[in-house]
Amino acid sequence: MNSKLLRSLMVLHGDTNASLAAYLGITENSVSNKINERGTEFKQREISKIMRRYDLSAEQVREIFFA
C-alpha cells in the first residue's frame, strides 16, 4: 500500500481520517489502521468508494492499494 500517495490525495481533496471514515462508513481508527498498515486492509467496497470519491483511474488504484 502506498500510504503517502493516499494521504496526498486526501489532502488535495480536503479530507481527514475522520471525513474519509464517515464517507466509508467505518471508524476513524479503522481508517488510520488501514492507511498505516496495522492489521486490516481496505476492503474492495471501500477501495471502490475511494476510487469514486477521488476520481481515480484503475492504474492509480493499483499504485495506491496494490503496490
Placement of each model-derived feature along the sequence:
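A short, Lys/Arg-rich alpha-helix, primarily the initiator
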Residues: M1-D15, Y23
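DNA-binding alpha-helical recognition surfaces that contact promoter or target DNA
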Residues: S8, A22, N33, E63
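Recognition helix of helix-turn-helix/homeodomain-like DNA-binding domains
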Residues: I26-E41
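DNA major-groove recognition helix of helix-turn-helix/homeodomain DNA-binding modules
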Residues: R45-Q60
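DNA major-groove recognition helix of helix-turn-helix
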Residues: I35-N36, E46, F65
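Short amphipathic recognition helices of helix-turn-helix/homeodomain-type DNA-binding modules
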Residues: Q60-A67
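Short alpha-helical "recognition helix" segments of helix-turn-helix
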Residues: S19-A21, I50
